[in-house]
Regions:
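Glycine-rich phosphate/adenosyl-contacting loop at the front of the ribokinase-like
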Residues: 1-53
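Conserved phosphate/ATP/ADP-binding segment of small-molecule kinases
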Residues: 113-185
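Active-site cofactor/substrate anionic-group-binding motifs, chiefly glycine-
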Residues: 46-98
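Hydrophobic beta-strand scaffold residues
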Residues: 54, 99-103, 161
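Charged C-terminal helix
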Residues: 12-15, 223-261
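Short, small-residue alpha-helix embedded
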Residues: 139, 188-219
Length: 261
């Protein structure tokens, strides 16, 4: 695993994102995804389009073995049944033992007290990146998703917070940036956010600077979404077009289209 630069400027991000994406394609990192049943197929296809190698088992009795052979781990709480609860804890313990980075996506954490409590237990195991939306942040952090709250939570939890929405925000409590790329049509495709988190995980597998990895992945995914939306006729074709856009994403496209501040 490499680090591109210790003190990048926000303006450097498009080029850095291109370099990290090239490393994903060159190294084909294995990403184990404990994700929700709705998201599995699309998530796997997004990872393949980016150049990573996905695995998806949720079986508690074998997930530790899969994680041990992976380069990074994604924990997505979308379908939080009993088997996935057990598997999530086992998977994170295995990742910690093997010093593999992992990402938490606390989907629908705002919908039930039990889910919020489980997500907070997962946070106590210190993911490298927490990727979520504003409503989910308010539920898990018990604070509104203003920049100062994001920064404070990132510092307190010793992780990167990657907040996605109309504008994405990424902070490690010190460094911060906002990404203004993306397309409304992305929100009309099931599992789009979940798949974006998987791309964060793939980038984290090849880049040990968690803030850079998360920032690069969200920028790449948002730009790919814009390119896909320009060609799509609706949600159905959007789901296909973003795979092609991600597979064809290059440095020139990122440098030309990125809107980062």
């Amino acid at each position: 695993m490499d680090t591109l630069t210790s003190s990048p400027l926000v303006s450097d991000l498009p080029g850095i994102a291109a370099d990290i994406l090239a490393r994903v394609r060159g190294k084909s990192p294995r990403v184990h995804c404990l994700t929700n049943a709705v998201a599995q197929n699309f998530t796997a296809n997004v990872l393949l389009a980016a150049g990573a190698v996905p695995s998806m088992t949720v079986a508690p009795d074998e997930i530790a073995q899969f994680v041990a052979r992976a380069d990074a781990l994604l924990i997505n709480l979308g379908t939080l049944d009993r088997e996935r609860r057990q598997a999530a804890t086992t998977a994170v313990e295995a990742a910690t033992t093997k010093q593999r980075p992992w990402v938490l996506d606390p989907v629908f954490v705002d919908r039930s007290r039990q889910r919020a409590e489980f997500a907070r237990r997962m946070m106590s195991m210190t993911p490298q990146v927490l990727r979520l939306n504003g409503v989910e942040f308010a539920a898990i952090a018990q604070a509104e998703p203003a920049q100062d709250a994001l920064d404070r939570y990132a510092r307190d939890q010793c992780c990167v917070v990657a907040l996605t929405g109309a504008t994405d925000a990424v902070t490690d409590g010190g460094r911060k940036l906002k990404i203004e790329n993306g397309a409304a049509l992305m929100g009309q495709v099931t599992a789009m956010g979940c798949a974006g988190t998987a791309l964060v995980t793939a980038c984290l597998a090849v880049e040990k600077d968690s803030w850079l990895a998360a920032s690069a992945a969200l920028l790449a995914f948002a730009v790919a979404g814009e390119c896909a939306a320009a060609r799509a006729r609706g949600p159905g074709s959007m789901a296909v077009e973003i795979l092609d856009a991600l597979a064809g994403l290059d440095r020139e496209i990122l440098l030309t289209r990125a809107r980062v501040r």
